């Protein structure tokens, strides 16, 4: 480093960067070696014998150097020692023929890379479309799923291209209609809402006449939950009703499409079966690792590997950008319809596919700046939905995959509706649409690394599931033993945790539309889910489903063994969420680690979010109860005990079959009908059906 001449004194001022080239004097080191000796520069100042010193200085006024200026000196090789440019050209000419051709090809590809890339994609797309057409020509019914997926993909690709290129033009084209709608929306919205309400009332009246009154009970339960949310709202006078009504409306439309229309039901049923088939491939890895008898330890070696496999697939889809694309589309739909903020929409859409601790990572940079209502909505969305990684585990329990998939989709708008009613927005959101919709593709460098990271990241989840089940089931056994011991002091040893929950949650389960005799059983399942976790609840539900499928007696020693199909369906929707006290700690810890500055707000709103998430699941179950076309259980006592001659109708046959299955016959004159039926009803069924499983001659003639 060299400094300016101290004799030159100039005042400090802002200076410009300058590059000064000047010859340097030869050093003693150069004179000691004859090969590097130079003539004195004053006597011979030729470019070939001089060195160039580049010095970058900060120049002052009139180019004078300052005392405190810093100068950087870079010594370069003498010009005379540089290789002649002719040598470079000679090396260039010495390249081989193949190397020159390779360089030519690379240069051509660089110049025409856009055209080449477009050509390759066009060839691949043409080949794929040719395969789709050929598959449809061979067997259209078999190729229908591929055809539909192809059409949907092409539609969204074209849509994204048009929106990216002509979004402003489309917006300008539609702006006159939007302005016209805004001018008349004040009175038009009342016409729209009144028409919708009248249509719902008319539809419910006709549907109730067709399927029974239980569907009407589900509608009453939906209204009851909305009233409760409004009464206990954080700011009941500040409720913005658009997201509430639109959330329930989207729930209803999705449920109507899936549960009542044949194309929708067939599509989701097909998706459910494909998911089950896809999850079945987990058995190959489990069999290789744990051996042929891996099913002997069903949960550890059959269920938990599904979580690993599903986590791997989700990580790969996230690397490819497909998950982010789907989340953006679903979030955009909820944003434009419900009027929710971009942050809320993205997180609610993300919770359909990923867990309650992963979805906030989609908007991690914005969490310190969200409002309290938005933070409450983020937590509510996590409690009201389940993760895709555990969805496969619930399906493997034997729970309907169609209903689980439907519940996962319907719960997203329900969470937004409940959250905005239970904690209305009183501040102005700071995050815009474009900033919230930006999502990263992860830190994986290739697809295999993404798969490996997905499998590795599932290890804590699998360990957490296994550890929690061991702890909670052991705790449940202890609590039941303690309650039984306490109840025995009052001559009631039947006291248990399930019994207490059945009375606490029975009104809620009944108002969802569950049959009265099944409401206590569903209430027990809700208790398992709320105080332990949904794994315990779905495990008990799967046992009830298996007992029904086994067609055993519905009552054994006066104890009901299983539920109706309608009650199972409603219970599936009510349990489909992470709303439990175990998840409460997970959410508080996870969000606090992401946004430490919001720790106080997270802790204060978590309990309300847990309640809101639970009610969101209940409202989804109410929608399922309204739209479910599964016939409710027949009042068999009214059918069989009315004293009339029985006719061979579907209702009578069903009631008689249930009566035969629940009857205990030990011998002549020793027959006990099940379900509190009389011997008269049993005799009437015997005269009608002549069952092979029961000796009707054992029934006493004198009744």
UniProtKB/Swiss-Prot annotation:
Keywords: Cell membrane, Membrane, Symport, Transmembrane, Transmembrane helix, Transport
One GO BP annotation of this record: pyrimidine nucleoside transport
Membrane topology: Multi-pass membrane protein
Intramembrane feature spans: 345-363, 523-542
InterPro entries from the UniProt entry: C_nuclsd_transpt, C_nuclsd_transpt_met_bac, CNT_C_dom, CNT_N_dom, Gate_dom
Membrane listed as a keyword: yes
Subcellular location: Cell membrane
UniProt similarity note: Belongs to the concentrative nucleoside transporter (CNT) (TC 2.A.41) family.
NCBIfam families reported for this sequence: nupC
Protein name from the UniProt record: Solute carrier family 28 member 3
Originating organism: Mus musculus
